[in-house]
Amino acid sequence: MGANNGKQSGSEGKGSSSISSDLSSSTDQTSTKAPKNAATSEDSDLSMRTVSTPSPALILPPRSSSAVLNGSSTSSSTFGTETIAMVHMPPTSLTHPQRCLRQPRDQQGAPVDILPDHAFLQIFTHLPTNQLCRCARVCRRWYNLAWDPRLWRTIRLTGDVLHVDRALRVLTRRLCQDTPNVCLTVETVMVSGCRRLTDRGLYTVAQSCPELRRLEVAGCYNVSNEAVFEVVSRCPNLEHLDVSGCSKVTCISLTRDVSVKLSPLHGQQISIRFLDMTDCFALEDEGLHTIAAHCTQLTHLYLRRCVRLTDEGLRFLVIYCPGVRELSVSDCRFISDFGLREIAKLEGRLRYLSIAHCSRITDVGVRYVAKYCSRLRYLNARGCEGLTDHGIEHLAKSCLKLKSLDIGKCPLVSDAGLEQLALNSFNLKRLSLKSCESITGRGLQVVAANCFDLQLLNVQDCDVSLEALRFVKRHCKRCIIEHTNPAFF
C-alpha cells in the first residue's frame, strides 16, 4: 500500500519488484540478522492487518534500494527508518519481463479459473494478508479482485514506527479509484498504538471516509481537538470513538470552541454512542459539559483517570445524556458522594459503574446508587476505603441482579457484609475481595453455600484458611479461585 499512479515507495533493506515478493521472502526464506532498531520480516507480516477483510497490500518495515523496470518504479529511495505503505501495479509483462505470462497453447487454464468473481471474493475474505498478497500476483483479474472495495470495510494499522499518515493517504487514494474522493465502503478505521499518527492522518480519514462508523486512535498522543472536530463534522454516522491516551483531546463538539456557551448547536448532534476518553488528563468539567451537550445519544462512556473532573461534570452528563448504560470514573480523585447522587439519576438504565480508587466515596454515595439503580449488573468499587458493611448491605438488598462486584482493598468490609451479599445476590458470578483485611473463611463459606453460580473468586492477600478454600471448591465447582495460599491447588 503506498504510492499512487504507478509511483511506489519503499524503505531500507532488500529491494523487490512487488509487495507480494517482499512478503514471500519474509515467510519462505530464512531472515538475516537485522540491524539494531530495525523492523524484522516478521514485523512486516503483522504491521497491517484487517479484522475480517484482509488487504493485498502491506505496511512494510524499513528497506532500502530501488529498482526500475521499463520506466516503472517498483521500490523507492530510502526514507531513513520510517515505515511506509506500498501499493504495486498489477502483474504484467512489463513489471515481470522475465516471466512469460502467456500460457502455452497445449496448456489449459486452471480449474479454479472457472469460478465467478463473487466466489473469489468470498474466498479472499478468509485469507490472511500475506496470502492475499501472493494471490494478487497471479494475474490481473486476481489483482483487481483483491482490491475490491468490499474487502475493505475495515482498515487496521499497527506499529510504532509506521508512517501511518502516509499509509492512510495512500490507502484511501487507492480505494477511491472507483468512487472519486470518497471511500464509501470503509466503516472502521483502527490505528491504535500508531504513535506517529497526527492530525494530518485523521484529516485524510475525515475527508475520504464519510460512512465511517468506528474510529480507534488509542495511544496516538499527537491527535488534538482539531482533528477530532474534522472527523465528527464530516462523518455523521460515527458511533464508536476511542481516543484513550490522547492527552491533547479535551473536547468533542461540532465547533472548534471548547466552551458550550460559545458553540450553539442549531439542532445538530453527534451520533456517538460509545466514547472512551481514558487517560485524557486535560479533560475538565467544561469540556465534559460540551461533550454531553453535543453527544446526547451516549450509552457507553469511560473517563478513567480523567483526574480533573469533579462532581459538577457528572451533573452536566446526567442532564444531557440520560441514556448512559455504562460509566467509568475510576481514579477520578475529585468524585465524591455528591457525584454518585447525580449518577443515581440515571436510575434503571445504568448497568455498569466503575468508581475504583475514588477515595472520597463512602456508604452514602453507594446507598444512592443502590436505591435508584436497581438494575445494576456490574460495580467496581475497588480501593474505596470509605465503603463498609452498611454500604454492601444496601447494595445487596436493592441490586438483586448484580452479577459482578469488586470490593478489593476495602479494609472496612468484613464477613458481615459478605453474609448480606450471599443472602440476597444469588445471581453473583464474579466477586473480588483482594486485599480485604477483615475477610475470613467464615464469610467465604456463606458465599459459597448460597451463590452456586459463582465463576470467579479473587481472595488474594486475604486471611483465608485452606479449609475455606476447599469448601468453596466443593460447592462452586465451576468457580476459578485466585488466591495466594501455596497449600491450595
Swiss-Prot record:
SUPFAM superfamilies: F-box domain, RNI-like
Pathway this chain belongs to: Protein modification; protein ubiquitination
SMART domains: FBOX (SM00256), LRR_CC (SM00367)
Disordered, as annotated region: 1-76
Biased composition (Polar residues): 32-55
Subcellular localization, as worded in the UniProt entry: Cytoplasm, Cytoskeleton, Microtubule organizing center, Centrosome
Pfam families for this protein: F-box-like, LRR_6
Start-end of each LRR repeat: 168-193, 194-219, 220-245, 251-279, 280-305, 306-331, 332-357, 358-383, 384-409, 410-435, 436-461
Residue ranges annotated for the F-box domain, each copy included: 109-155
InterPro entries, alphabetized: F-box-like_dom_sf, F-box_dom, Leu-rich_rpt, Leu-rich_rpt_Cys-con_subtyp, LRR_dom_sf
Major localisation: cytoplasm
Record-level GO cellular component terms: centrosome; cytoplasm; SCF ubiquitin ligase complex
Biased composition (Low complexity): 1-31, 64-76
Stated role: Substrate recognition component of a SCF (SKP1-CUL1-F-box protein) E3 ubiquitin-protein ligase complex which mediates the ubiquitination and subsequent proteasomal degradation of target proteins.
Protein name per its UniProtKB record: F-box/LRR-repeat protein 7
